[in-house]
């Protein structure tokens, strides 16, 4: 889908190249610079959910980097098998979070279409409400999966911080903070959608899981950060 918006950059060669590139590629194929350029535009995708997923992918990649700097070092021979397994898990989490960048954009499309449906007659109003409810559910599922995946990543980055190379421990701390931010950011995308849901029981269920993930993993990420700080200061 080509995103149509006006940012004052229409005559800019870089902007035109990005828009042409967008017709046949994924957001995760963009350069960092191009992704930020598109993110700063008026189009709703990529948005906060995709940005959160990307932040999470960067966060766990930092943990994976710590693992890469640990494997093969005699000092860490005793934990090498554990670190290798952690790196495999980190690769999987990274791939899933990058996929969620795309899925978040895809989930917004039916919601956007639902907002644009006519509501001139009782039948149209009823149909719009039905389609809107289904779209809101879909728009909650992706950020909830981002949260779940970031929670896995926080558990994993704790191991990188504890067992990984001490010269790179600060990178594990940075990764933990990014994953916490990604978790929190994804939760906001749940809350804004559940607020509009007619099925209050379903909305409460989504909110409950988001609240529980935040309660456990915001604290855990903070603990990792604080332990890293205590070791390097």
Q: Where on the chain are the PLM-derived regions?
A:
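Short, hydrophobic/aliphatic alpha-helical segments
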Residues: 27-46
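Polytopic transmembrane helical bundles with strong interfacial aromatic enrichment
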Residues: 21-30, 145, 192-193
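Preference for long, well-ordered alpha-helical segments
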Residues: 153-156, 168-227
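Short, Lys/Arg-enriched N-terminal segments with co-localized hydrophobic residues
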Residues: 3-18
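Amphipathic alpha-helical interface segments
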Residues: 104, 108-177, 181, 193
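A structural-propensity feature for long, helix-poor, extended segments
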Residues: 74-113, 213
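Conserved phosphate/anionic-ligand binding catalytic regions in large, soluble enzymes, centered on
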Residues: 41-64, 167-186
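Transmembrane signal-anchor/signal-peptide helices with a preference for the extracytoplasmic
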Residues: 65-77
């Amino acid at each position: 889908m080509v995103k149509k918006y006006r940012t004052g950059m229409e005559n800019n060669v870089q902007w035109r190249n990005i828009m042409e590139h967008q017709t046949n590629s994924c957001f995760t194929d963009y350069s960092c610079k191009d992704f930020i350029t598109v993110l700063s535009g008026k189009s709703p995708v990529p948005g906060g959910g995709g940005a959160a997923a990307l932040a999470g992918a960067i966060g766990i990649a930092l943990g994976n980097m710590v693992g890469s700097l640990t494997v093969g070092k005699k000092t860490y021979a005793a934990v090498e098998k554990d670190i290798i397994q952690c790196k495999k898990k980190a690769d999987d989490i990274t791939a899933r979070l990058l996929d969620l960048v795309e899925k978040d954009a895809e989930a917004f499309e039916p919601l956007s279409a639902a907002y644009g449906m006519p509501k001139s007659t009782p039948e149209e109003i009823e149909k719009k409400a039905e389609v809107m409810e289904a779209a809101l559910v879909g728009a909650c599922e992706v950020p909830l999966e981002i949260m779940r995946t970031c929670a896995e990543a926080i558990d994993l980055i704790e191991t990188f911080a504890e067992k990984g190379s001490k010269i790179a421990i600060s990178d594990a701390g940075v990764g933990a903070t990014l994953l916490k931010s990604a978790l929190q950011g994804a939760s906001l995308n749940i809350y804004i959608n559940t607020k509009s849901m007619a099925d209050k029981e379903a909305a409460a269920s989504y909110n409950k899981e988001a609240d529980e993930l935040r309660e456990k993993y915001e604290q855990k990420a903070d603990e990792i950060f604080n332990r890293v700080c205590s070791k390097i200061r």
